[in-house]
A protein has these predicted regions:
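Loop/turn-rich, solvent-exposed surfaces of beta-rich toroidal or solenoidal domains
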Residues: 220-281
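Surface loop/turn motifs at the tips and blade-to-blade linkers of beta-strand repeat domains
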Residues: 32-37, 78-82, 114-115, 123-127, ...
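Residue-level detector of Asp-centered blade-edge/turn motifs that repeat once per structural unit
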Residues: 44-47, 91-93, 136-139, 180-182, ...
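Beta-rich catalytic cores
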Residues: 13, 37-38, 85, 130, ...
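Short loop/turn segments immediately following the C-termini of beta-strands
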Residues: 8-10, 54-56, 101-103, 147-149, ...
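Asp-box/WD-like beta-propeller blade repeats and closely related beta-sheet repeat scaffolds
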Residues: 73-135
């Protein structure tokens, strides 16, 4: 299967988009490379890939995005995200929705802006909104995590606010996944490592509970969250602690099965495909690979060195 790895560095330091064929044993065969400054995140779309660039361009403080074909050869012109430090996006047909972390907004097609307001209790990280995640729900709404205000918000396709739900103050909601039946949301918190559970229906989330993650390092923070294809297992990565936690999932109940060393430093992103988990360890410039059996992780011997790996996308 094809996998794209994003190196969030300048071109002169090896930054760009790397394409590999990933074999069942975790071995990689390089298939392509596109040089670009500081790619932050990417999603699949009809045009190939839609890619966020964190680096501002042409004396503009805003981030940019562009499209590129799956062979990493043909690109569109850069477009502004209309905000600072874009960090996540989703594509719906011809529409692209982007969140700008520092600007605290959600932007559709570089035109329509939904500006978040408010703050929470963390003295430095929550003095203003910080949108960190956006994705389309199965019923056509757009879910957004606002770390700065501890809020899970839902918008319609024109970015009109549908509903909001709060997580515990100071926890800093970051990313989320839905259960396979669409009835539950599992959202990782960054500032206090933990997972929120919500019941979901028709663009509205009901907060149910938060499961805290025991950490040895008080500076640990939550990063990425993924669900296995069968919906039975939830995976959560923690930076500083440098682990991936594995939970058995049963509706609103999470049961910790394993806490696995990520094999590197700062597992900012990872993804699961079949019986493999691929982890991007940002600060150790290292991609690590894990075999999955009954949900549990076993680290494989092969590794890949890559400068500042920030994102992974399966083709």
């Amino acid at each position: 299967m094809r996998v794209y790895l994003l190196s969030c560095e300048t071109v002169e330091n090896g930054g760009g988009i790397y394409a590999y064929d990933l074999l069942e044993d975790g071995q990689l065969k390089r298939q392509g490379y596109f040089a670009c400054d500081r790619p932050m995140y990417a999603v699949k779309c009809e045009k190939g890939l839609c890619v966020l660039l964190r680096q501002p361009f042409e004396n503009d403080e805003n981030s940019c995005y562009f499209y590129i074909d799956e062979r990493l050869q043909n690109t569109t012109a850069l477009q502004s995200t209309l905000g600072k430090v874009a960090c996540h996006l989703t594509v719906d047909a011809d529409d692209v929705y982007i969140v700008n972390y520092l600007s605290g907004n959600i932007v559709k097609n570089g035109e329509v802006i939904a500006q978040r307001t408010g703050k929470s209790i963390h003295p430095t990280r929550q003095t203003e909104p910080h949108t960190h995640f956006v994705n389309k729900t199965a019923d056509g709404y757009f879910a957004t995590c606002d770390l700065g205000t501890d809020t899970l918000a839902f918008y319609d396709k024109d970015l009109r606010l549908r509903s909001e739900s709060k997580v515990p103050s100071g926890y800093g909601i970051r990313h989320l996944v839905f259960s396979n039946d669409g009835k539950y949301i599992y959202a990782v918190n960054e500032l206090v490592p933990s997972v929120n559970i919500f019941a979901y229906r028709d663009g509205k989330a009901e907060y149910l509970n938060t499961v805290k993650i025991d950490c040895k390092n008080e500076k640990a923070d939550g990063a990425a969250i993924r669900l296995s294809a069968d919906g039975k297992y939830l995976y959560v990565s923690l930076r500083v602690e440098n682990v991936i936690c594995v939970y058995a999932v049963n509706g609103e109940t999470l049961t910790l099965l394993q806490t696995a060393d990520c094999g590197g430093n700062s597992p900012r992103d990872f993804d699961v495909r079949g019986n493999l988990l691929v982890c991007c360890n940002e600060k150790s410039n290292l991609i690590t690979f894990f075999a999955i059996s009954n949900g549990s992780l076993t680290k494989l011997d092969n590794e890949l060195k890559l400068p500042s790996p920030l994102g992974i996308l399966f083709g």
